[in-house]
From Swiss-Prot:
Subunit-level organization: Constituent of preproteasomes, but not of mature 20S proteasomes. Within the preproteasome, may directly interact with PSMB1/beta6, PSMB4/beta7, PSMB5/beta5, PSMB6/beta1 and PSMB9/beta1i. Interaction with PSMB8/beta5i is controversial. Forms tetramers.
Gene from which the chain derives: Pomp
Per UniProt, location of the Glycyl lysine isopeptide (Lys-Gly) (interchain with G-Cter in SUMO2) cross-link in this chain: 39
Protein's organism: Mus musculus
Name recorded for this polypeptide: Proteasome maturation protein
A single Gene Ontology CC term: cytoplasm
Cross-referenced PANTHER family: PROTEASOME MATURATION PROTEIN, PROTEASOME MATURATION PROTEIN UMP1
Entry keyword annotation includes Transmembrane: no
Length: 141
């Protein structure tokens, strides 16, 4: 046995490539690659899915560029500051929020869409014990 020890002899004698699985039945190596996220491996199921996900962002960018061309740089900056201020205000975690002020800033308060009918607060996924939810939000648990 040399000065490196028994572990180094075993490591040198057995190639690592032979121990790794390959082929269609290969399992994910958690120690080397970490946890796998299926969400990152999925492709959009429809060509319009990405467009629908980014619709509001694209709509806001278009409105800001129109405002900048018509009224100058001040109008989109003011509107962006109002958006940031409205998005920072939150209710307690167990109370449903309609984000009415954000809808007013975007002009969505004058339209009726499917989210107005199908977005019933009583069917929310966040229903739970109020005290536990607040303690979790504040980091006390």
């Amino acid at each position: 046995m040399n000065a490196r020890g028994l572990g180094s002899e075993l490591k040198d004698s057995i190639p690592v490539a032979e121990l790794s699985a390959s082929g269609p039945f290969e399992s994910h190596d958690l120690l080397r690659k970490g946890f796998s996220c299926v969400k990152n491996e999925l492709l959009p199921s429809h060509p319009l899915e990405l467009s629908e996900k980014n619709f509001q962002l694209n709509q806001d960018k278009m409105n800001f560029s129109t405002l900048r061309n018509i009224q100058g740089l001040f109008a989109p900056l003011k509107l962006q500051m109002e958006f940031k201020a409205v998005q920072q205000v939150h209710r307690l975690p167990f109370l449903p929020s309609s984000n009415l002020s954000l809808d007013i800033l975007r002009g969505n308060d004058e339209t009726i869409g499917f989210e107005d009918i199908l977005n019933d607060p009583s069917q929310s996924e966040l229903m739970g014990e109020p005290h536990v939810m607040v303690e979790h939000k504040l980091g006390l648990l």
